[in-house]
Amino acid sequence: MDGLRQRVEHFLEQRNLVTEVLGALEAKTGVEKRYLAAGAVTLLSLYLLFGYGASLLCNLIGFVYPAYASIKAIESPSKDDDTVWLTYWVVYALFGLAEFFSDLLLSWFPFYYVGKCAFLLFCMAPRPWNGALMLYQRVVRPLFLRHHGAVDRIMNDLSGRALDAAAGITRNVLQVLARSRAGITPVAVAGPSTPLEADLKPSQTPQPKDK
């Protein structure tokens, strides 16, 4: 318990978006940041347990701040933060894929969204060894190194087949268009071709003879 408290206090001493917001609230209210953080975590947990739209709130927590931090990482000259957030998005995508198949069962558990939110916060925690880095090093990276050759071959084969199929469809469409265009014949339009012919035709009409 003391180790967890020390980690929380160390996190609150760092400079990031969360601590900046807590610092501004501390300056206005006079309440210490650790109490504000504890109150915010308690309110968030209660809302995830009993509030409406817990799934949407969880997804926003797992997406909004990481997206903001990723944009800052792209714009910064350092590449270390790029690696950190790329690792997070890999783990986030795999977690979303696993959740797609298990959400119908897990969403019935009362503490599911609280656990999901805690997991996402652990994965994005601004510390040298957060949940995303831990899962990547222990699970994702070994699987990738073991199977990336076969995956690359499958992807290359699928991309080649897709290009061949697209080329065949394009060729067939062009052939159909060419055949339909060749089958159209011009239709002659009836009517006088010149004004002179239009003037001569009434005079050629036979007149009745006088008896």
UniProtKB/Swiss-Prot annotation:
GO CC annotation terms, alphabetical: clathrin-coated vesicle membrane; endoplasmic reticulum; endoplasmic reticulum membrane; nucleus; photoreceptor inner segment
Cellular localisation: Endoplasmic reticulum membrane; Cytoplasmic vesicle, Clathrin-coated vesicle membrane
UniProt biased composition (Polar residues): 202-211
Membrane spanning residue stretches: 44-64, 89-109
Region Disordered: start-end pairs: 190-211
GO biological process, alphabetically ordered: detection of light stimulus involved in visual perception; endoplasmic reticulum organization; regulation of intracellular transport
UniProt keywords, alphabetically: Cytoplasmic vesicle, Disease variant, Endoplasmic reticulum, Membrane, Retinitis pigmentosa, Transmembrane, Transmembrane helix
Tissue: Expressed in circumvallate papillae and testis. Expressed in the retina. Isoform 1 is predominantly present in mature optic cups. Isoform 1 expression is confined to the cell body and inner segment of developing rod photoreceptor cells.
Membrane topology: Multi-pass membrane protein
Primary location class: endoplasmic reticulum
Pathological association: Retinitis pigmentosa 77: A form of retinitis pigmentosa, a retinal dystrophy belonging to the group of pigmentary retinopathies. Retinitis pigmentosa is characterized by retinal pigment deposits visible on fundus examination and primary loss of rod photoreceptor cells followed by secondary loss of cone photoreceptors. Patients typically have night vision blindness and loss of midperipheral visual field. As their condition progresses, they lose their far peripheral visual field and eventually central vision as well. RP77 inheritance is autosomal recessive.
Function as written in the Swiss-Prot or TrEMBL entry: Required for correct function and survival of retinal photoreceptors. Required for retinal development. In rod photoreceptors, facilitates stability and/or trafficking of guanylate cyclases and is required to maintain endoplasmic reticulum and mitochondrial homeostasis. May play a role in clathrin-coated intracellular vesicle trafficking of proteins from the endoplasmic reticulum to the retinal rod plasma membrane.
Family according to the record: Belongs to the DP1 family.
Subunit record text: Interacts with STX3. Interacts with clathrin.
Protein's recorded name: Receptor expression-enhancing protein 6
Taxonomic lineage of the native organism: Eukaryota, Metazoa, Chordata, Craniata, Vertebrata
Annotated gene: REEP6
